[in-house]
């Protein structure tokens, strides 16, 4: 903790100046805003005067750390991650442009170049600490080659874990239904609480997608470069139909330098939020894009490739957007009623639909390209969490739904693995006893296998083994396996399309 006994007022005055200079330098405020923003900040901290001074440049993280420590020392907040996050968002809001200013700047830049507009918006999201880059930089990431190509792995450390006291306090906090969910447009400017993150630095850009109003924002956790979310202005559930595909293509027409996709609309094979219609996009090269074709067809000027990929995928490529849309709709509607009981694929049971798709759209030169990934969410006694879902022998690494991002070959693995994998390395190296770590019990069977393997570098070895596990998880999620039986089944389905 910083010692505030001496000159604390002068130190805070300096930090406020440094924050204002940071905001000026990064185009968040203009010179005419300086006094206004200074007054917002001194009011926030209960300070009664401010003096402008020449200051040395300082990182935003150092500035915020000082201000948060000051607030803890003064009893404004408790020394917890949640309360600090609520306050530092409130601090940054004092130097944020209003939502209308952001929208107008975006539109002005867009009229010149769509990429300039998204560059501005993404930079603002980073500069404002809405995207907490200092935390995201802690994520562990690596890539290793497998039979399907390079697979990307991340261990996500950007969401801080709450301590028991925070959890207890949050449990006793007043519960509200406003905003209805984390995606609703009403989050813009929301101060947050112990159960809902502050969103005062959150900004959104309205979009017309084929006559429907959506909004563009960036994910505060950016799982990949320029990870954006495009959400419906209304709090309405996810759905999958032709209009979904039309929205994806409309987005790509507006932002051809981005890709976009949608999670499936059913539990188990869908994402974590099914209650609010949304898509995810960004500017990142996913492993799936390099997948090779096993078989190729042509249908009404559309090239159709059956991909060599763990999840069963048909890739549609054409200069004609309408032809791709028509064929994608036909694939989806046919798949929704298609069954192949020999491969455990049953479309409907007791009036409940099990088949759906995960669609992904991108531009490749002048051509439209759409990946249609076939999904099924059936459960059985043997597989109560899903037949085409990570199986129990892999849950020690990944047990969550395989959503859009994982479908494309980017693993988002839980933070616990950072510590657990390091402990396993120590055990493999003979520097620790496996049974002295209770949290490793879930890895016991895997560890027994790892002990039988030969390797020269334990770090590289463990990365490769984690990659193998993730690939196995993706293969579990594929409705048609990449073997003779599976490919024959896949071909039978494709033949029903023409």
Q: What do these predicted regions represent?
A:
Residues 242-246, 321-329, 468:
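Generic alpha-helical secondary structure signal
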Residues 214-219, 244, 248-252, 296-302:
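Structured alpha-helical segments in the cores of large, soluble enzyme domains
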Residues 226-232, 270-286, 373:
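Histidine-centered divalent-metal-coordination microenvironment in nucleic-acid enzymes
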Residues 5-230, 234-237, 308-310, 325-328, ...:
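Active-site microenvironments that recognize anionic phosphate/pyrophosphate groups
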Residues 200-205, 233-260:
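Helical scaffold of the NTase/Pol beta-like nucleotidyltransferase catalytic core
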């Amino acid at each position: 903790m910083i010692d505030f006994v001496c000159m604390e007022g002068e130190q805070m005055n300096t930090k406020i100046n440094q924050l204002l200079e940071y905001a000026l330098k990064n185009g968040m405020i203009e010179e005419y805003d300086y006094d206004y923003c200074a007054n917002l900040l001194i009011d926030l901290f209960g300070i009664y005067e401010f003096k402008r001074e020449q200051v040395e440049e300082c990182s935003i993280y150092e500035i915020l750390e000082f201000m948060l420590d000051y607030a803890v020392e003064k009893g404004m907040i408790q020394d917890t991650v949640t309360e600090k996050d609520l306050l530092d968002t409130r601090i940054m809001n004092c130097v944020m442009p209003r939502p209308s200013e952001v929208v107008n700047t975006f539109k002005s830049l867009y009229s010149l170049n769509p990429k300039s507009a998204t560059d501005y918006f993404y930079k603002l999201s980073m500069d404002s600490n809405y995207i907490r880059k200092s935390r995201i930089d802690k994520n562990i990431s690596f890539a290793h080659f497998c039979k399907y190509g390079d697979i990307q792995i991340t261990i996500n450390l950007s969401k801080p874990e709450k301590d028991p006291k925070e959890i207890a306090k949050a449990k006793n906090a007043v519960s509200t239904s406003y905003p209805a969910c984390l995606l609703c447009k009403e989050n813009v400017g929301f101060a947050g609480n112990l159960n809902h993150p502050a969103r005062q630095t959150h900004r959104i850009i309205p979009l017309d997608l084929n006559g429907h109003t959506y909004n563009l924002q960036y994910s505060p956790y950016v799982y990949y470069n320029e990870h954006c979310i495009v959400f419906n202005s209304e709090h309405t559930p996810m759905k999958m139909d032709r209009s979904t595909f039309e929205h994806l293509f409309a987005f790509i027409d507006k932002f051809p330098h981005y890709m976009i996709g949608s999670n499936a609309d059913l539990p188990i094979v869908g994402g974590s939020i099914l209650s609010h219609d949304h898509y995810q996009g960004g500017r990142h090269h996913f492993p799936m894009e390099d997948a090779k074709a096993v078989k190729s067809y042509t249908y009404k000027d559309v090239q159709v490739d059956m991909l060599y990929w763990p999840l069963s995928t048909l890739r549609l490529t054409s200069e004609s957007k309408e032809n791709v849309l028509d064929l994608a709709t036909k694939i989806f509607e046919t798949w929704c009623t298609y069954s192949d009981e020999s491969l455990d694929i049953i479309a409907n049971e007791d009036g409940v639909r099990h088949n759906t798709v995960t669609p992904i759209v991108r531009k490749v030169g002048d051509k439209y390209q759409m990946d249609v990934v076939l999904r099924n969410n059936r459960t059985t006694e043997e597989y109560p969490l899903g037949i085409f879902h990570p199986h129990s022998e892999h849950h020690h690494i990944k047990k969550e739904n395989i959503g859009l991002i994982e479908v494309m070959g980017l693993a988002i693995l839980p933070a616990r693995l950072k510590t657990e994998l390091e402990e396993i390395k120590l055990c493999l190296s003979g520097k620790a006893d496996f049974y002295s770590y209770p949290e490793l019990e879930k890895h016991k069977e895997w560890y027994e296998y790892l002990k039988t393997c030969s390797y020269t570098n334990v770090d590289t070895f463990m990365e490769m083994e984690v990659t193998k596990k993730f690939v196995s998880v993706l293969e579990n999620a594929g409705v048609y396996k990449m073997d003779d039986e599976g490919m024959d089944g896949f071909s039978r389905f494709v033949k029903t399309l023409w």
